[in-house]
Amino acid sequence: MSSTTIEAGLSEKALLVHRALASLQEELEAIDYYNQRSDVSVDGTLKEVLDHNRDDEVEHAAMLLEWLRREVPAFDFQMGKILFKSGSIPDIAKGKTSAADDGRGLGLGDLK
């Protein structure tokens, strides 16, 4: 784990967030390991097992992201602004999107 340094005197909330972030790092690392091993596997059955394990780790990472979104307002704000939108990711992050592609409604834009 790369986040072994913990500041003294942290609040319980900060410790919980640290644990979630450290766990997320570990899940992402495991996803990468399984993905690499699957990519070079020459045995079809082993590849299936590795893909299954990788996808389980993706589920774990998604659960941690959802916990962070619920508990950390900045995660909630940024995830709401950026995730599940179409168009250029940098433009979305800069707020350069129209109402038609903000993930709400039918994507018809302004009908006036």
Name what the model sees in each region.
Residues 1-112:
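Iron-associated oxidoreductase/ferritin-like identity signal
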